[in-house]
Swiss-Prot record:
InterPro entries: Beta_CA_cladeB, Carbonic_anhydrase, Carbonic_anhydrase_CS, Carbonic_anhydrase_sf. SUPFAM superfamilies: beta-carbonic anhydrase, cab (SSF53056). One of its GO terms (biological process) is carbon utilization. One of its GO terms (cellular component) is cytoplasm. Induction: By cyanate. This is Carbonic anhydrase 1. Keywords: Lyase, Metal-binding, Zinc. Binds 1 zinc ion per subunit. Its cofactor is Zn(2+). It comes from Escherichia coli (strain K12). Its EC number is 4.2.1.1. It is an enzyme of class 4 (lyase). Zn(2+) binds at residues 39, 41, 98, 101.
Length: 219
């Protein structure tokens, strides 16, 4: 904890004064344009990867960057999605997986997680991705795990669209969905192209979307 407290003291001493005007503005309101849903993994820092300032991203993080399908008893992820879309009215949602994801590797390798029942239950929300991934050939476990990361991003994009707030925003043409996979070693991002159903380098394809803004559905 000493390093964390020392870091806070350095923030107060050096970083905060440089952004004092920004924090004063943010003290009473926020208006992020993007909901960023990522894994809890310590190696993926959304604000660092996207070079965003405080107030720019509304962030949800959990093991496996999972969005459970909407159900009769919505949980914390569902509530956060609804708030971001209906109250904050974000214009973009990013679901971001990453290389060497422990959760997806555990699924791909069929690891027994009886000693972590809560984790085991949570990862069931990636079952649709697991089924697709198991049906495809893979040369080795690392390639199978990497494919699982990609399939999971696609599956969570589908789950996201079961949420009423997201579905309405899509129909109204005021939100776009993005599926990314961040590579820790290279710092690159592969983005899911909804038109081709392929992942492509984001740097070379900055406009690619899983689901772009649509024309509003006629009443």
């Amino acid at each position: 904890m000493k390093e964390i407290i020392d870091g806070f003291l350095k923030f107060q001493r050096e970083a905060f004064p440089k952004r004092e005007a920004l924090f004063k503005q943010l003290a009473t309101q926020q208006s992020p344009r993007t909901l960023f849903i990522s894994c809890s993994d310590s190696r993926l820092v959304p604000e660092l990867v996207t070079q965003r300032e405080p107030g720019d991203l509304f962030v949800i993080r959990n093991a496996g960057n999972i969005v459970p399908s909407y159900g009769p008893e919505p949980g914390g992820v569902s509530a956060s999605v609804e708030y971001a879309v209906a109250a904050l009215r974000v214009s973009d949602i990013v679901i971001c997986g990453h290389s060497n994801c422990g959760a997806m590797t555990a699924i791909a390798s069929c690891q027994c997680m009886d000693h972590m029942p809560a984790v085991s239950h949570w990862l069931r929300y990636a079952d649709s991705a697991r089924v697709v991934n198991e049906a495809r050939p893979h040369s080795d476990l690392p390639s199978k795990a990497a494919a699982m990361v990609r399939e999971n991003v696609i599956a969570q994009l589908a789950n996201l669209q079961t949420h009423p707030s997201v579905r309405l925003a899509l129909e109204e043409g005021r939100i776009a969905l993005h599926g990314w996979v961040y590579d820790i070693e290279s710092g690159s991002i592969a983005a899911f192209d909804g038109a081709t159903r392929q992942f492509v380098p984001l740097a070379a394809n900055p406009r690619v979307c899983a689901i772009p803004l649509r024309q509003p559905t006629a009443a």
